[in-house]
Amino acid sequence: MSLRLTMQKKSFPRILIAAPQSGSGKTYLTCGLLRLLSGNGRRLHAFKCGPDFIDPLFHKQVLGIPSGNLDSFFTGEEQTLALFAKEAEGYDLSVMEGVMGYYDGLGGRLLTASSYDLARITKTPVILVINARGMSRTVVPLIKGLLSYTEESWIRGVIFNRVSSSAYRILTKCMEEIPGVKALGYLPELKDASWGSRHLGLIQPEEIPLFQNQIDALANQLEETLDLEALLSLAQSAPPLPPPSRSSSSGAKPSPSPSKVTALREEPTLLSPDQREEPALPFFLQKKVPIAIARDASFSFFYEENLRLLKEFGANPVFFSPMKDAHLPKASGLILPGGYPELHLQELSRNTSLLQEIRDAIESGMPTLAECGGFLYLQKSVQDMGGQSFPLVNLLPGSAHKNSRLVRFGYLELTAKAGQDLPYLPSGEKIRGHEFHYYDTDANGESCTAEKPVGGRSWDCMVSYKNLLAGFPHLYYESNPALIRRFVERCRGLDG
């Protein structure tokens, strides 16, 4: 499944919200902007730069629609641009939220997968969010340095965070020294403006008391202190892009698999596409295959692009709650995504009927993908934060426990080992993803080799058992759609 760009260009109004560093208020301000800009009947689409799961959940809560991830490490330049064009088509405005500091990419050393890289690939005007509390004229060399670091920075505007109206007047005078970059407004200190964190990121939006009220108050404040007309004009100034061709799942070739990580330059080099045989019938004409996908407070980390690709290959997602549903829904396949099962171990462990059904289904050969939290769920037991163990599915022999520090964090490329008979990833084939987890287990598997894109560090991982492929890595299916095509086809083969 490879999206291609056609030559005819089309307008996609868009902006990217970035910052010099993490903690500047990108997510908070992005959510307020989404609420504010969605007024007057505008149809908005949100995107997150990079692999993060939490920020798109905030975007989704504000807009009531899915938020996509765009990542140049996962999919390379052409495919990233095509994914944006496909998902943004039909919307009045796209708002992308950046990641970390503006130029922070792979390994903290490369530009690949940085906010700048996404702006460059998609030719998107960038608005910097600068936490200017306790700062005035220093913003000038700060912004000038970011502008001069590359030949074309794409930075066009600035919003100052945590400043008063009087401080903003001084800052706007300072900004007169920076031609081509406009001060678009400010956000003063607001009560309840700080959202807590867990593990690596923000807590989830449904856990914040009166979240919608907070966003409404934020949007009302921004309406008073932002130059909305100038911001919308900036979005309209984004150059036209070629829209994706209408290559659907009806026999489209899968996109290239990533190259060997050690050869990675600032832009990923991709192998030639897999010249697979096309199906006898296009996927959209074939019978839809029901695939059960865990989705609740324990399992909420699943890329919208992954879900869309499943559907394009003929899957009919059937969502269920491992916390509340006593039985597995009728389905021919199973996906257990990541999330925070460690926070809900008592509820998960008490649901013994579902635990048994999942174990029996996998033992009987049901095609199953499990990653991170879903991988923990399949273990014999998992300890909570206090060290108490809870029995879970008990399909895998491991016992999982929390570490005081991160076990692994960051991007990886997964390669199926030679001689391994993996159900969906042939020997030597690759797929890209990332890990971030404090939990570890004594049964991590050794069917694949994971390698970091910078530095070349590698380790064994992934469990392959019958039709199960499971491990800690979160996989981004668009980096090798052939894997998910094989998964759906195996589910279809078992669909009675």
Where are these regions (language model features)?
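Phosphate-binding active sites in nucleotide-utilizing proteins
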Residues: P282-F284, V289-T352, Q356-A361
